[in-house]
Amino acid sequence: EPYRRQRQMCIRDRYIGQCYLFLRQVENNPGETLLQEWLPGEKEQWLAEAHFLIAYYHFALLRKYGPIPVITEYVPQSTPSSEFGGRCHYDYCVNWIAYQLDLAAQNLPPTREGTEWGRATSTMAKALKARVLMYAASPLWNGQFPFSSWKNKVNTPGDKDFFVGDDAKYKESIGRDDYGIELVSSSYNEKKWERAMEACQKALDFALNEGGCRLYGTEASDMTLYQTELGNNDKWLPYVPGKEDNNIQENREFKERVMMLRYMVASRYPHNKELIWGLTGKNINSRIQGRIPAHIFQTGNKTSWAGGF
């Protein structure tokens, strides 16, 4: 298990490095070896996608390990560990990630379709920013961290420059000129909740409008999608003890709601408009393995536990 955790961290660090390598190649390349000709806005969108992923991978590490080193440029593999400054203050990490997502959202489309589905959008960037800020406002990272003696060996710089646009009003109430060697704030700041709530509302409004999203089940087509596919009969309705008679309106509505909840997590794109960032890279085997109790399932040669179990 310790090896598995270390491997996950290394993978995300590697992805961050690959993103920065991509940015360097794009910025330093006129386009001949990448594309014969840039389409209007294409280069800016590629750069924005890379910044979105950099922010996302930093958040994935932050969520798992707390304060982390913030990587702002490509780091060669030969770099000695002595040149790394260590972890940054948790709030600094949060504000830097939020800033990166704001920048990325400026050059990302609100939606994707067809073969581009799953690539970064401004809707995803705003939703991810809202989640990052919600974590930062929660009690663990907002005044109730149990290990007050946990300190860094080097100072974390200030982050007021990260508060731009609508976040500029929180520059003085949340941002700092210098964090010193502190890694987690020991004092409660109500402004963090205010900022998080505002980000959530903006993300929701943007998703409902520019993003074309809506809650699943709010339109009649959600209730009848698979009824149409399976035929206009009652065979698509589930069996529910005590509610066998489909001619009773209450029974029918209950069964339709049961089916709606089933298809909410199984509907194929683009039927479920509630999806903001769909994940299509997982197969059924990985989901099954993820539900198997620890030390039950071994690899084929029986030398290790599959999936880390």
Identify the role of each PLM range:
Residues E1-I11:
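Single conserved hydrophobic/aromatic residue that forms the stacking wall/gate
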Residues G31-Q36, P110-G118, G143, L208-E219:
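Surface-exposed patches in mature extracellular/periplasmic domains of secreted proteins
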Residues L21, Y74-Q77, R112, M134, ...:
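Short, flexible loop/turn elements at secondary-structure junctions
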